[in-house]
Amino acid sequence: MASVQASRRQWCYLCDLPKMPWAMVWDFSEAVCRGCVNFEGADRIELLIDAARQLKRSHVLPEGRSPGPPALKHPATKDLAAAAAQGPQLPPPQAQPQPSGTGGGVSGQDRYDRATSSGRLPLPSPALEYTLGSRLANGLGREEAVAEGARRALLGSMPGLMPPGLLAAAVSGLGSRGLTLAPGLSPARPLFGSDFEKEKQQRNADCLAELNEAMRGRAEEWHGRPKAVREQLLALSACAPFNVRFKKDHGLVGRVFAFDATARPPGYEFELKLFTEYPCGSGNVYAGVLAVARQMFHDALREPGKALASSGFKYLEYERRHGSGEWRQLGELLTDGVRSFREPAPAEALPQQYPEPAPAALCGPPPRAPSRNLAPTPRRRKASPEPEGEAAGKMTTEEQQQRHWVAPGGPYSAETPGVPSPIAALKNVAEALGHSPKDPGGGGGPVRAGGASPAASSTAQPPTQHRLVARNGEAEVSPTAGAEAVSGGGSGTGATPGAPLCCTLCRERLEDTHFVQCPSVPGHKFCFPCSREFIKAQGPAGEVYCPSGDKCPLVGSSVPWAFMQGEIATILAGDIKVKKERDP
């Protein structure tokens, strides 16, 4: 029975272990097991297969590597078989009695030394793969040194484990700048940190350059463009900004905030281009639908290893009216005729502009479920500044202030002449950190309400720093909207930009960096003692919602937000004694 099961097994090309057929994945150029796919990631399997193929040819096989089972079509196996057929015939090895399956008491290194000293390498026939005691179950000889070197070489293809020189020699096409993209891999998929950051910064720089031209054209109402193009752009621009989301994962939300017309390949004169920020509040700008759809497709990880087969319009949905839950396919609004300016956009499909002075309220934080899957993608539910190397890919202050523009003469253009974006407000907060609202020089600065602390989620910093409790997705308050937000939140201290922050429950004054912020209602601010008592009153079981007692839903969703376990642990930490303590 054991021999029957062994004969049914297939060898994984990466780990060289026998696997049952149901544990194998055949969607790549070589058969790999599901364990390797899950561990490495489907987007890196082809790269690792290529690295393993090069290593097997140049490093492992000349030292006596077995050709493996005949069921797999390994190129290295074919090369070795051809070389063995053409080379000089070696004398047959002397039979050495050994117990089956264990190799006896003789070490693998001793057998390797005897084989090399006699001028031969052990290359048994496929019929003896499962019977020779000197061979492992995967067809490899018991040469521990060689096997260990091969294992390290194969695992070394992961970043940080393999020296750059060895990887450059093993992977074809690797230059001094690092890995190049393998065929079939999307440019938006990260390979190595430095290369990905450079590529991301270059892409953002190109997008911002195009966005600058679009904003200049918007200010001039696209003077010099054909009438149909101008009317179409003005009509669509009057609807911006509006939310878009990925059709297969509703937690991936962005927003379209600008439009432009670009030169079109032969056949049409102009082509519609839209600019999307994804994720909301991140400052990452994508020019065109395909780029943002590809990134959302990659973040969703529903179909790993595959790529978009269309322009991306069928993968995105837009919200026709903010907060209504009415989502439609983006292709229904931007049809082929609309994108080529041959016909106007249908009036009944046009989204309604969200009439909110503060653009931060447009996109709420994504639901909790998708925020735990991906580390590379900034889908964290926070509004804290991130100074570590991300400023190069962000929009400039002038472009940030322009990204939530409304039509001149519109109903809100006079009310918000200088409303900054959330990113600009966060930068102001970052510069003002360390200054209490009680300081004399802090009265004229921006309101440090809205959870404008470096408090993010409990996974970002250790609890001993006590800087991370606020779950504020997009609750930043700008100077012009500060009075409305503070008075609406019930601070009761006047509608001045320098008004102190007060707890919604006990009305005590809050320290500017030590409080809990509701991500849905900007006016819900709570001190640590009140939050701690509320959490203790809820008991250990069940979800803990907003300390106000309401189940505040996430913006654009009916699902109420709840504290994460790490945040609860941080709030319940007993070393926080007072509300107004200062950082050293």
From Swiss-Prot:
Enzymatic class: transferase
Modified residue annotations for Phosphoserine: S66, S125, S186, S371, S384, S421, S436, S453, S457
Bridged cysteine pairs (disulfide): none
Chief location category: nucleus
Covalent cross-link Glycyl lysine isopeptide (Lys-Gly) (interchain with G-Cter in SUMO2) as placed by the record, residue numbers: K227, K438
Zn finger (RING-type) location: 503-550
GO MF, one example: zinc ion binding
Any one biological process term the GO annotation gives: regulation of transcription by RNA polymerase II
EC number: 2.3.2.27
Family: Belongs to the IRF2BP family.
PANTHER family reported in the protein's UniProt record: INTERFERON REGULATORY FACTOR 2-BINDING PROTEIN 1 (PTHR10816:SF17), MYELIN TRANSCRIPTION FACTOR 1-RELATED (PTHR10816)
Name the record gives this protein: Interferon regulatory factor 2-binding protein 1
Gene: IRF2BP1
